Amino acid sequence: MSWRKCAYNLRLRRAPLLFEIVAMSKTNPNVDDDAVIAATRRWVEQAVIGLNLCPFAKAVHVKEQVRYVVSPATTPEALLEQLMDELQLLSDTDADKVDTTLLIHPFVLTDFLDYNEFLDVADAAIEDMSLEGELQVASFHPDYQFADTDVNDIENFTNRSPYPVLQLLREDSIERAVEAFPDAEAIFEKNIATMEKLGHDGWDALHVGPA
């Protein structure tokens, strides 16, 4: 079972997950990594957890088991290389230390359609690394758009992050979280209702944009 129970991307295949902070990267000297991570963490706290868009997120958040990494990549090729490094690191690291990784990439795949196409590359990397069934990638983007929606439809904001993000997830953590939630099938529909009630003005009031 996938994290579709929380939300879907344009191709209806992925969704949000478990969060918290344990580390950050060294990256472009012209970019304030702390500010990028702070903006991303605020989005997690105010939107993902605050609006209960993913009921599984809060428990992991308080355990501080998320690795935040700001990528300096400016090309898809460079991002892929770093993604593979982070996939291997997550696979090699005890889940008690790092349960999930948020790979934030402000300088590449800023166009959502390009980003969405890259998700197939990410899936292929997992397969090539023999990590299928162990890890998967969830997707968030400032211009996230579900299939069959208009750009400004409020439901798209369930997966809109301050910066493009690839979230690296452990399959076994996903399975345990879904098994523990009594009505996982209803999460996506509930999220749409939450966003419709909140509206665009309510979303803007959360101040979860980029730094």
Please identify what each model-predicted range represents:
Residues S25-A211:
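Expand to "…catalyze enediolate/carbanion chemistry for C-C bond making/breaking, isomerization
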